[in-house]
A protein has these predicted regions:
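Toprim catalytic domain recognition across nucleic-acid enzymes
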Residues: 1-353, 357-384, 389-392, 396-400, ...
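Leucine-rich, amphipathic alpha-helical/linker segments
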Residues: 207, 211-215, 412-447
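Hydrophobic alpha-helical segments
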Residues: 254, 352-355, 382, 408-411, ...
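Conserved small/polar residues in nucleotide/adenosyl-binding loops
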Residues: 451-458
C-alpha cells in the first residue's frame, strides 16, 4: 500500500462492530465447509470401504473434470469439407459441408473458371489492452506459458511479495486505486526505459484505464513494485523471475496504446457459388508489440498465439474479375472438447454456478483465488486427478466417486445457495445460528438418507 492510502485509512477508521456481520458470514462459511466435509467424507468412506474426500468446492470441481472426460469419450468425430478457390495470391473459402460429393461438385464446377468480387467490406477494429492480473488470471497465464501449477505460481508470487518485489497476491481485483496512480506511472516509465519489453511501449501511460476504486475490495491487482529498480533480477530463482516478468509485461500492456487494425471481408462469386476471403492490416500495434517482444524473449511458438487472423488481402474492388481460378477441397474432422488444463479449469471454476448467485455476492464460482490452487492439489494428492503433462484427467476412482455422490454435493448450485444465504447473514437478514442450523440439518439428512438406504458397501469405487 502507498503511504497516502495508509494515512487515508487511519483517518477514516470505522468501529470494529461495523464488521461483526461480515465476520459472522466468514465464520459460517468456514464452519459449513467443515461440517459438510467431515460428515460427507466419513460417510462415503465408510459406505465404500476406501477413503473418499468430499467437499463443497472439491467435489463440484472434480465433477467438472469428469463431465469433460465423458464429453470427450462420447464425442463422435465427423468429417467436413470446405471448397476453396485461389485467385490473385489469396484463398477464399466456401461453406463447410458434411457431404463430400456436394463439396466435390462445387470444386469441379469452379476449377479453371472465372470468379468476380461481389462485395468488399472494410472495418477498423480495436482490441483493448488486457486487464491487470488478479491471482487466478496470473495462475492461468503461468500454466499456459510456463506450465507451472496453480500452487507453484502462488508460491512464486508469495515469495516475490515477501521480497517486496510484488504487491499482495491473494486478490480477485484487476484494478488499482486512485491513490496509486502517481507511483504506478513513475514505475511504468522506469520499466519502459529499462526493460527489454519497454521497446514496444508507445505513448504515455494510461493509468485511468486500470484505475477503479469501486472494483477494488480487499486488495488491488497484482503489479511489480518500485523495488524492482534496485534488484538484480538474474539472482532470482527462475520461477520467481518468470512470474515477475509476466507482472511487468502485463503492467506495460495494460497501460499502453490499444491494438488497431483494418479487417477486410471480400465476398466472391464463382459459378453462382459464394466464397469468402478475410484479411487484416495492422494500423497500430499498441500493446501487442510489448507482448510480441516478450514472446520472442521466451522463444514461444507463434502458433500458440494465432488469433484466427488472416494475412492482409491485396487491394480488391467490387466487380473485379479473376480468370481461371484454382479450386481445391480442404478436408477436416470435427474435434472433441479438449482436456482441462489448470489454465482452463481455473477459468471454469471462476464461472461455475455464477449465474445462480446473487448479483452482489462477494464470491462467485468455485472457491476463491486464494483457495483454488489448494483445491487442485487436494484432488491430485487424493488420487482423483493425476497430472499428465499439462492435462488434468480424472482417474477411475474419481469418476466413480462422482457417479455415487448426490447431485447437490457435486453441483456448484450448492455454493450458489450458500453464498446467497451468507449474503443475508452479512446484511443482518439471517442469523448465523439459523444458517448453521440449516447446514446441520442438511448434513443429518445426507447421512440418514444414504446410510440407511440399501447398502452400497458391496460396490467398489
Amino acid at each position: 500500500m502507498e503511504d497516502a492510502a495508509i494515512r487515508e485509512g487511519f483517518d477514516h477508521l470505522r468501529p470494529g462492530s461495523d464488521y461483526d456481520k461480515l465476520y459472522d458470514a466468514a465464520v459460517c462459511r468456514a464452519g459449513a465447509d467443515w461440517l459438510i466435509g467431515i460428515n460427507a467424507t466419513r460417510l462415503f468412506s465408510v459406505l465404500y470401504g476406501v477413503t473418499l474426500n468430499v467437499g463443497r468446492v472439491m467435489s463440484p470441481t472434480l465433477a467438472l473434470l469428469v463431465q469433460r472426460e465423458s464429453d470427450i469419450e462420447s464425442f463422435i468425430s465427423k468429417p467436413f469439407y470446405v471448397p476453396e478457390i485461389t485467385c490473385g495470391g489469396f484463398t477464399a473459402s466456401g461453406e463447410k459441408m458434411t457431404e463430400r460429393s456436394e463439396a466435390e461438385k462445387i470444386r469441379m464446377d469452379c476449377d479453371h473458371n472465372s470468379a468476380f468480387v461481389r462485395s468488399v467490406e472494410k472495418q477498423v477494429k480495436t482490441i483493448q489492452p488486457p486487464r491487470l492480473y488478479d491471482l487466478t488470471t496470473l495462475q492461468r497465464e503461468c500454466n499456459r506459458i510456463y506450465g507451472y501449477t496453480a500452487q507453484q505460481t502462488l508460491d512464486y508470487v508469495q515469495s516475490l511479495y515477501e521480497k517486496k518485489l510484488a504487491t499482495y497476491p491473494r486478490t480477485d481485483s484487476q484494478y488499482l486505486t486512485k491513490d496509486m496512480q502517481a507511483t504506478a506511472a513513475s514505475l511504468i516509465l522506469w520499466l519502459r526505459d529499462n526493460m527489454t519489453f519497454g521497446k514496444g511501449y508507445a505513448g504515455e501511460p494510461d493509468i485511468d484505464r486500470v484505475t477503479d476504486d469501486s472494483k477494488v475490495t480487499d486488495h488491488h491487482a497484482i503489479i511489480p513494485t518500485v523495488e524492482i529498480a534496485r534488484t538484480d533480477l538474474s539472482e532470482l530463482p527462475s520461477g520467481e523471475r518468470d512470474v515477475l516478468t509476466l507482472l511487468v509485461v502485463r503492467l506495460l500492456c495494460a497501460t499502453t496504446q490499444v491494438h488497431r487494425f483494418e479487417a477486410v471481408t471480400a465476398i466472391l462469386d464463382c459459378q453462382g457459388y459464394t466464397f469468402t476471403a478475410k484479411g487484416k492490416t495492422i494500423l497500430q500495434s499498441g500493446w501487442k508489440e510489448v507482448e510480441r517482444i516478450h514472446r520472442m524473449s521466451i522463444r514461444q511458438s507463434e502458433t500458440e498465439h494465432k488469433e484466427n487472423e488472416a494475412v492482409a488481402l491485396p487491394v480488391l474492388q467490387e466487380g473485379q474479375t479473376f480468370e481461371a481460378v484454382s479450386a481445391s477441397l480442404r478436408e477436416g474432422k470435427t474435434s472433441p472438447p479438449k482436456h482441462y488444463t489448470e489454465d482452463t479449469l481455473l477459468s471454469a471454476m471462476e464461472t461455475a454456478g455464477a449465474e445462480d448467485m446473487p448479483e452482489d455476492a462477494e464470491r462467485k464460482g468455485l472457491g476463491t483465488p486464494a483457495t483454488r490452487a489448494a483445491t487442485l492439489e487436494k484432488l491430485v494428492s487424493a488420487g482423483f486427478v493425476p497430472r499428465k503433462k499439462k492435462q488434468l484427467i480424472p482417474t477411475t476412482t474419481g469418476r466413480n466417486l462422482i457417479a455415487v455422490l448426490p447431485d447437490n454435493i457435486k453441483s456448484p448450485i450448492l455454493t450458489a445457495e450458500w453464498e446467497s444465504m451468507l449474503k443475508q447473514v452479512e446484511h443482518g437478514e439471517l442469523s448465523a445460528t439459523s444458517f448453521m442450523d440449516q447446514i446441520a440439518d442438511m448434513s443429518r439428512t445426507l447421512v440418514c438418507l444414504l446410510y440407511t438406504s440399501p447398502s452400497p458397501r458391496d460396490r467398489s469405487v
